[in-house]
Regions:
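HotDog/MaoC-like acyl-thioester-processing domains
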Residues: 1-18, 99-103, 108-166
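Hot-dog-fold acyl-thioester-processing enzymes
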Residues: 2-88, 150-166
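Generic detection of short hydrophobic beta-strand segments and adjacent strand-loop junctions
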Residues: 24-29, 93, 143-145
Length: 166
């Protein structure tokens, strides 16, 4: 992830700036993606795998698995392995709209809080909105990452949202 932090001689980096935002490149969802994800997970629900069944349903066509969309979002967000130690959690996951074959998704991410844990690490919380090619939100999630670089003597900072990400 692009950050304002810089590497130091010890190999650590500052935590990202509060409020920092990034919009990723896009990725178009293909039929092969649906088949591959179904094969990997064993989720062959007809909404994803049966064109005739899906055509008669709520969305009128096959749509991507919600977890596939979330997994691809993780792959779209660039994280520096020298800074990001581990994914610590996902919270407030919601799937707002279907993603169909041929849709292109991208991720808008914002740093919402930085909480120093010790002399070398912080817990950084990101608000992610997964958008389609029409800039409509298809999914939202709060992502917590263990970040190398901030120190415990730095104050905890947080953005207190006055609205829910839509």
């Amino acid at each position: 992830m692009s950050t304002n932090g810089t590497a130091t001689e010890t190999g650590t980096a500052e935590a990202p700036a509060l409020g920092e935002e990034l919009i990723t490149r896009g990725r178009t969802i293909t039929e092969s993606d649906l088949v591959s994800f179904s094969s990997l997970t064993g989720d062959w629900h007809p909404q994803h795998a049966d064109a005739e069944w899906a055509a008669a349903g709520r969305f009128g066509e096959r749509v991507a698995h919600g977890m596939m969309v979330l997994s691809y979002a993780v792959g779209l967000v660039p994280f520096d392995p020298e800074r990001v130690v581990a994914l610590r959690g996902l919270d407030s996951v919601s799937f707002k709209r279907p993603v169909a074959i041929g849709d292109t998704i991208r991720v808008h991410t914002r740093v919402d809080s930085v909480r120093p844990l010790d002399d070398e690490h912080s817990l950084v919380s990101f608000a992610w909105r997964v958008l389609n090619q029409h800039d409509r939100v298809v999914a939202r999630v709060r992502v917590d990452a263990l970040w190398r670089g901030a120190t415990a003597d730095e104050p905890e900072t947080e953005i207190v949202p006055n609205t829910v990400l839509l």
